[in-house]
Amino acid sequence: MSNNNDKYAINTVGITQKDNVVNVSVSTSEKAEELSDELISKGFEKKSFDIIVDEMRPTPAATYARPGDRVYTWTGGTRGSHIATIGFNAKNSSGKNGFVTAEHALWYEKNLGIYEYDCSSVSNCTASKSTDSCFVPFNSGITGLTGLINNSGLYGNTTYKLTASYNASADLEGVTLTGFGKTSKKYTGVVLRTSVSYSLTGGDGTLITDALEMKTAYKKPAGGDSGGTVAKIKDASVTPQTAILAGILSATSDYTSTSGNYTLAYVPKVKNITTALNVTFYGGSN
């Protein structure tokens, strides 16, 4: 019967073992009659099958490039090393879905993707040097947008949902933010200043402006965490925990002082990123 799926608009086929009856769902009543006639002509007794009209065909489960997941290099359809982290999902002005990560992840690569899929050639990505961010459009293999950080291999069994994003003028001084990255996994820091400028070592001298400066201790961000989500955990009492997106990780500087060692992390603001890339942040529950 598998060769006739399209001919008879078959949605599903199953067996009720108790009654030894084959259950078939098709999309239209006309196809139901045609299939019934076909089965009877092949010698099947009418009591041996049950045909149901179901106009809705099952749809494949969506594949997501989730915030906090690893960004990989791809060459000729072969996955390479993981070099950065997804910050958030977005949609561009042409209606194309994709994810945002650090612009400097593009410097020496030709294709970027996730574990399962090569998403885009770098030439198809939209980049903003002044916010160290880039939009990587999805290929046809990824079918859904998501605001859910859900990677048990990196962040344990806790899931987080990006439900909103901060405005560029939000006063976050003194606020504790949580970062997600493929190397350090999860780290926290306190915002020291809400508008700083800096240039990336090894870059082209472009000045990144109006970024958050965050002081981290204990576990600190490291290589590969670039582009990753930085957010305020809004409600840890619910599942998934809700969070407000502040920006993505761009760079770090290590300091040693008499009071101890610490790291400053620099976080371009989400609103500046979406404006520069002309994309819309997606926060949702998938």
Give the positions of each predicted feature.
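Short glycine/threonine-rich beta-strand-turn micro-motifs
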Residues: 5-41
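Generic structural motif
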Residues: 18, 29, 56, 91-93, ...
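Short acidic/polar capping segments at secondary-structure boundaries
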Residues: 20, 29-31, 56-58, 104-107
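Terminal interaction modules at protein C-ends
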Residues: 62-286
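Conserved short beta-strand edge segments in small beta-sheet-based binding/regulatory domains
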Residues: 45-56
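Surface-exposed, low-hydrophobicity interaction/linker segments
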Residues: 1-2
